[in-house]
């Protein structure tokens, strides 16, 4: 019963305070006409596909972007034997935005620290999951930036 009351109260508060989702269709005021990649990596392809999802074909703000991304995995901590115990994965996305009125370059990055795992297969699966999460964060940042242009 308490949960129902809290949910109803929260919905009234959020509706009355002017809350709007970040990615509502009216906020996407850009159309990506062309996405070119400096290198043809899987990382660039994933980012390009995610960016296309947020493109609004009805927008008057038509842009072309050139993307270049880099993924780094660094050892941040070692155990007593000298084996890595903690890593940091960082993804950096450089975007060159081209419009008839301007040419801007912006960089977005996101990183995550994680522990080593003795099961290398499980570690690789976890790294893929981390990579996808970091890509989503970077795409969110870039969509917000592109919406503000």
Label every PLM stretch briefly.
Residues 145-149:
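Amphipathic, coiled-coil-like alpha-helical scaffolding segments used for oligomerization/assembly
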Residues 48-49, 53-54, 59, 66-107, ...:
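Surface-exposed short loop/turn segments
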Residues 29-54, 58-59:
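A positional/architectural concept
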Residues 1-4:
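Positively charged n-region of N-terminal signal peptides that target proteins for export
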């Amino acid at each position: 019963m308490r949960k129902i009351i809290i949910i109803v109260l929260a919905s009234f508060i959020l509706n009355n305070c002017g809350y709007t989702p970040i990615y509502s269709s009216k906020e996407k005021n850009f159309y990506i006409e062309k996405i070119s990649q400096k290198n043809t990596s899987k990382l660039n392809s994933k980012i390009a596909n995610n960016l296309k999802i947020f493109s609004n074909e009805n927008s008057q703000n038509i842009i072309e972007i050139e993307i270049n991304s880099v993924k780094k995995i660094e050892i941040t901590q070692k155990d007593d034997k000298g084996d890595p115990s903690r890593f940091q994965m960082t993804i950096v996305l450089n975007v060159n935005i081209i419009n008839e009125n301007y040419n801007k370059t912006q960089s977005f990055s996101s990183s995550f620290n994680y522990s080593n795992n003795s099961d290398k297969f499980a570690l690789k699966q976890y790294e893929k999951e981390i990579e996808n999460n970091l890509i989503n964060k970077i795409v969110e940042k870039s969509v917000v930036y592109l919406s503000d242009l």
